[in-house]
Swiss-Prot record:
Residues 1-18 form the signal peptide. Pfam families: ATP1G1_PLM_MAT8. GO terms for molecular function: sodium channel regulator activity. It comes from Bos taurus (Bovine). The gene is FXYD6. This is FXYD domain-containing ion transport regulator 6.
């Protein structure tokens, strides 16, 4: 009888260990489906690329390329003119 019990326990041990490893594989949070992730990323990239091309071709963007290009020092000159204009104006007396 003891031999039969040892034999049955010997048969059950691999089955228990196999089911335990299957449960560990299911609980593994770092198992990713890379093929689906790659396809999803490519679809997302194609959609963004298509939207960009449609925006460029639709001419709804109010980018005006006909503006006269400014000289690099124009903005600095405007700020300096405002500062000097405010400094030279007489200040009004407060009542």
């Amino acid at each position: 009888m003891e031999v039969v019990l040892l034999f049955l326990c010997g048969l059950l041990a691999p089955a228990v260990l196999a089911s335990a490893t299957e449960q560990e594989k299911e609980k593994d949070p770092f198992h990713y489906d890379y093929q689906t992730l790659r396809i999803g990323g490519l679809v997302f990239a194609v959609v963004l690329f298509s939207v960009g091309i449609l925006l460029i071709l639709s001419r709804r963007c109010k980018c005006s390329f006909n503006q006269k290009p400014r000289a690099p020092g124009d903005e600095e000159a405007q700020v300096e003119n405002l500062v000097t204009a405010n400094a030279t104006e007489p200040q009004k007396a407060e009542n």
